[in-house]
Amino acid sequence: MEGVLYKWTNYLSGWQPRWFLLCGGILSYYDSPEDAWKGCKGSIQMAVCEIQVHSVDNTRMDLIIPGEQYFYLKARSVAERQRWLVALGSAKACLTDSRTQKEKEFAENTENLKTKMSELRLYCDLLVQQVDKTKEVTTTGVSNSEEGIDVGTLLKSTCNTFLKTLEECMQIANAAFTSELLYRTPPGSPQLAMLKSSKMKHPIIPIHNSLERQMELNSCENGSLHMEINDGEEILMKNKSSLYLKPEIDCSISSEENTDDNITVQGEIMKEEGEDNLGNHDSSLAQPASDSSSSPPESHWEEGQEIIPTFFSTMNTSFSDIELLEDSGIPTEAFLASCYAVVPVLDKLGPTVFAPVKMDLVGNIKKVNQKYITNKEEFTTLQKIVLHEVEADVAQVRNSATEALLWLKRGLKFLKGFLTEVKNGEKDIQTALNNAYGKTLRQHHGWVVRGVFALALRAAPSYEDFVAALTIKEGDHQKAAFSVGMQRDLSLYLPAMEKQLAILDTLYEVHGLESDEVV
């Protein structure tokens, strides 16, 4: 549905006509239909907002996300408001029903997996008992050979049952958790790093003419270019020739969009052109030096040698780009973005079998980020987050940011260990993974988790397939210059990663935050 509604802006401009479009469960608005190519000035997700009918004005309705977003709207007539209410309510109901069904299926699959995991623990205990029994029979000598045969048969049967149950666990996980629930970037997390033609702090999407603009609009869900940002934010910055997308921008809503309470919004905030803007913005647009192409980076020659880009040289955010702050402070935002940028390595190892590892890594990033966005001004470094929780005596509470960061750095150590093995010339991916796991995560895992990892190792790709997945241009891995490029990029990436992990290790050791808990 689309049409004109009056939107409350501020006490200076009052109610102003805006063109609204309801599409795909998102209500977005523009100055006019003719200005739609510029991108929407604001939008609201119907699935999470409340629809309130005004008690006095029979043409007014309010769309509210408590504590975040407020749309105060008026229709031109009672009948028109009723049509909008029906359309908005239907969109909200459809989205809610769909989401409820997905959540129900997810919960059922989770319960099934928990049941199988309980069975695994039972068989694990039986295995331990039967191994002890086998040892006792062995120490008695060969006189009681029949008993030894019986114990051996029983142990073999238990092992087979254990492996069968473990495979069933993996089948449930593969069937249930390979949907968008697993692979999409979770809300409240930094945008997953994408391969760019060059490292840029602020990605640029050039739009040179009205035809290209229209093509971009046709590909968008709600008629505007947008990208996911922390806390579900979508921030669209406009310019005459380009749209600049900048993640992690904290703004106060402009004066035209303010109510008398001067509400600060962490959701979408759009700066309206041609109107009074008396609000203060915390961040400003970064102007690009020149237009960039969105095509993959090409290899080039320097001093007679071919330079081939790799996954690590084209990462949007890298540990090697992080500049430490005062007292070796690790900037929170840059660190979390760098963590997200390395997550695709797990997809290249196997998006299904390594899904549990990826889910754990992403979950811990999200937990730390949720703490960060509660007070971005204070939690500028990881150390400040940890020390804040230490002082509040919640650092070792379950699901705290400190605990999440503990497991996050352990997961990063595993990835660093694996990449170090590859850099040092290990051609067997299974061996590289097993060595890295043995040095990092294995000591923190119990029998069941170790068994799951052992099963995942069987599906690890060959060295050739893994290296091919790290190329930007197909076939580059067959060139000798690509191996040189991998060595070059990892020689920059791994030491920077190791330095920051060492700083975190020291922080946790000084405050006694390391844990021997086994999962």
UniProtKB/Swiss-Prot annotation:
Assembly description: Homodimer. Interacts with ARF1; the interaction together with phosphatidylinositol 4-phosphate binding is required for FAPP2 GlcCer transfer ability.
Subcellular location: Golgi apparatus, trans-Golgi network membrane; Membrane
Gene Ontology, cellular component aspect: cytosol; membrane; trans-Golgi network
Protein name: Pleckstrin homology domain-containing family A member 8
Disulfide-bond pairs as recorded: none
Residue numbers carrying Phosphothreonine: T139, T153
Sites of Phosphoserine modification: S145
Span of domain PH: 1-93
Membrane topology term: Peripheral membrane protein
Notes concerning its domains: The PH domain of FAPPS binds the small GTPase ARF1 and phosphatidylinositol-4-phosphate (PtdIns4P) with high selectivity, and is required for recruitment of FAPPs to the trans-Golgi network (TGN).
CDD domains: PH_FAPP1_FAPP2 (cd01247)
Chain intervals for the UniProt region annotation (Disordered): 274-302
Biological processes annotated in GO: ceramide transport; ER to Golgi ceramide transport; intermembrane lipid transfer; lipid transport; protein transport
Keywords: Golgi apparatus, Lipid transport, Lipid-binding, Membrane, Phosphoprotein, Protein transport, Transport
Keyword Phosphoprotein: yes
